[in-house]
Amino acid sequence: MNLIFGADGFIGKQLSRQIGSKANCFDINTAYDTKYCDVRKPIEIEFENIAVIYNLAAIHKTPGHAYSEYFETNINGAKNVCNFARNENIDTIVFTSSIAPYGTWEDEKFEDSLPLPTSPYGSSKLVAEEIHKRWQAEKPSERKLIIVRPGVVFGQNEDGNFTRLYRAMKKRQFFYPGRKDTKKAAIYVKDLVRLMVEMAEKEEPGVHIYNTVYA
């Protein structure tokens, strides 16, 4: 059985479809088929035989929130999810971070590149990664931590930059927002969730970080 925190978001909905009946879905929003959970507070839910936690819960829209909100949600959420995993003896967490911890620099980045975040979102995600790493380090031979760092995630119901680009092109109103040579690191949402599930199943105990973008 699997738990998904942040299941009502764009990626969370696709992940719950990928996992199917083996997923228990939680979110602060319950418009979708989810149960209520606010990861900013201690998590008090009861399940047995949980194999994997998928932690997608986050504030990510930039700009759009006060700086403090990114840290309150993304850092407290990481702490509370890890504490829940400790209390329930769950040994696998898949955490969705972002390429934002790398900052806005344009040189090619690898998983071992030095993070240099330039936004509160990127900084909060980097701290959240470290919180998850501390959880794994407590029992390094038993616990498995998968950190995925997606670029721009696109797909049906994304309702973001790719959706706006598609609508503009459909109306023959395409234009370059900013520089014409801007590069975007991206991944299709169904490819992302498929990789997340595969890595949770196949990886050995340890910390595994993946930049999940197309090369």
Residue ranges and their predicted role:
Residues 116-146:
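Active-site Tyr-X1-5-Lys
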Residues 23-44:
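Adenosine-cofactor binding site in Rossmann-like domains, unifying the SAM/SAH pocket
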Residues 158-164, 178-201, 207-208:
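Substrate-positioning beta->alpha
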